[in-house]
Structures are given as C-alpha cells and as structure tokens.
A protein has these predicted regions:
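NAD(P)-dependent Rossmann-like dehydrogenase/reductase catalytic/cofactor-binding core
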Residues: 94-97, 101-142
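C-terminal substrate-binding/catalytic lobe of Rossmann-fold NAD(P)-dependent oxidoreductases
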Residues: 1-110
Length: 142
C-alpha cells in the first residue's frame, strides 16, 4: 500500500524553501513538496523536478550537479539519464543522485536515494559531529 501525505503543507516545506533560497540566491524559488509512504524498512527516494534558467542546457545542469558533489565521499552522481534505486543505498551512509531529461526541454528530474536510518539519521549525525570537531569525516561510519 502506498500513501501520499503532506501535500502542499508538509512539515519540512518551510525549511526546504529556506535552504533553496539560500543556495540559489533567488527569492522567488519555491518548492511544492509531498511525501509518499511505501512499505519498505529502509530508504527514501525523492523526485525533484527543476526548471533551469531559460537557455541552460541539460549538460550544464548535469555539470553543475556533478561539480557540486564530485569530491563528496558519501555522494555518488550517476551518468546522465541514469536513475538510482533504493536497494543500492540500504545499510550505507551514501546518497546517490541521478539527473534525467524528459520529453520537455525545460524540465529535468533529479532522483535522489538514501537510507533514512543511516544517512537520514545516525550516519548523518556522526558525519556532522566528525566535521564539526575536525575529525575524519568517516570516523565511526565506515
């Protein structure tokens, strides 16, 4: 059974919009967000639809995504138009991102998967603690 919740009023929407505005430096950027509950023990899959600035190519968007995360230990970027699946992140502290081009030239989909019990909770807390205390980022995680 699959259930959608938080349509238009999800508890994290204010935080998501706040961080998008900071990252994009565009005050008119906003997200409409809802979540889906599925019967799995671990894993979150997010579909994030983006409308890039007019004239920005798919390759430019992919390069931006790739360059932003290429040096991050726990974030993997798939090749263009490849889509991640949740089974590839179960029991890991990693996030896998894919960027897919659809039939419309001005809409792309970023697909993100992570293990909500590691990267989404305990693993992320350990990673943040390590970084804040200038320890090796992966101490106690790997």
């Amino acid at each position: 059974n699959i259930k959608t919740y938080g349509v238009g009023d999800h508890k994290h929407i204010a935080e998501i919009n706040q961080e998008i505005k900071k990252a994009s430096k565009m005050n008119n950027s906003e997200v409409f967000f809802s979540a889906n509950l599925i019967p799995v023990e671990r894993g979150i899959l997010s579909n994030i639809y983006v409308n890039p600035i007019k004239g920005t190519s798919f390759d430019e968007v992919y390069s931006c995504l790739y360059n932003a995360y290429k040096s991050e230990k726990y974030i993997n970027i798939l090749d263009q138009n490849e889509i991640p699946i949740t089974k590839d992140v179960v029991n890991t502290n990693k996030v896998i991102l894919g960027l897919k081009k659809g039939y419309k030239e001005d809409v792309y989909c970023i697909v993100s998967v992570l293990d909500n019990l590691l990267k989404g909770a305990a693993g992320q807390a350990m990673q943040n603690f390590n970084i804040m205390n200038k320890f090796n980022e992966s101490l106690g995680i790997d």
